[in-house]
């Protein structure tokens, strides 16, 4: 995931279920479950929700409260980052709310990564693909990688 300057503005409080996330000089609030944040009506906040596919599987029914909360994000100037390694397992009702989708791959030999920012669309074979809008090519930055433990298990939502 590539975060632009807008996401790093120091006055934006961050809510996350990633307990190991520590960013110097940032106000971070940790939560356990989606139910802990759906009543949050604060303006101009960042919500980072890891392993969203553990809470909402491909066949699950729509969570109307969470869906409504997501739809209100634009009006409340919220940035919501839903993280999953199983994009195809996220239900369609949740994919439809996404404004952008980021997908990252590592180049085979070099320690270089490519992240595509784009829109998820169904191709002719009914497979989800990303229509790239922007491409980021980068080498991982140890400073950023040290913000959280990428191996931290997220067991509840």
Spell out what each predicted region is:
Residues 1-9:
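Glycine-rich P-loop/Walker A and Walker A-like loops and their local beta1-loop-alpha1 context
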Residues 1-2, 31-36, 65-68, 87-89:
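A generic local structural motif
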Residues 10, 24, 96-98:
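Short, structured coil segments at secondary-structure junctions
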Residues 11-13, 43-46, 76-83:
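Loop/turn-to-beta-strand initiation segments
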Residues 15-43:
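Short glycine-rich substrate-engagement loop in P-loop NTPases that contacts/grips substrate
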Residues 48-50:
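Conserved proline-anchored active-site loop of SAM-dependent methyltransferases
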Residues 116-157:
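RecA-like P-loop NTPase motor core
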């Amino acid at each position: 995931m590539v975060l632009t300057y807008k996401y790093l503005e120091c006055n934006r409080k961050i809510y996350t279920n990633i307990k190991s996330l520590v960013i110097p000089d940032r106000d971070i609030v940790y939560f356990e479950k989606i139910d802990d944040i759906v009543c949050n009506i604060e303006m101009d906040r960042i919500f980072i929700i890891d392993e969203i596919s553990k809470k909402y599987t491909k066949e699950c029914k729509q969570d109307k409260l969470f869906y409504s909360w997501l739809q209100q994000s634009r009006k409340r100037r919220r940035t919501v980052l839903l993280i999953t390694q199983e994009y195809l397992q996220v239900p369609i009702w949740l994919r439809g709310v996404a404004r952008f989708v980021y997908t990252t791959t590592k180049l085979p030999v070099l320690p270089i990564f490519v992240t595509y920012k784009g829109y998820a669309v169904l191709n002719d074979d009914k497979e989800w693909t990303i229509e790239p809008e922007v491409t980021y090519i980068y080498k991982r930055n140890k400073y950023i990688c040290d913000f959280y433990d990428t191996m931290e298990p997220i067991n509840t939502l």
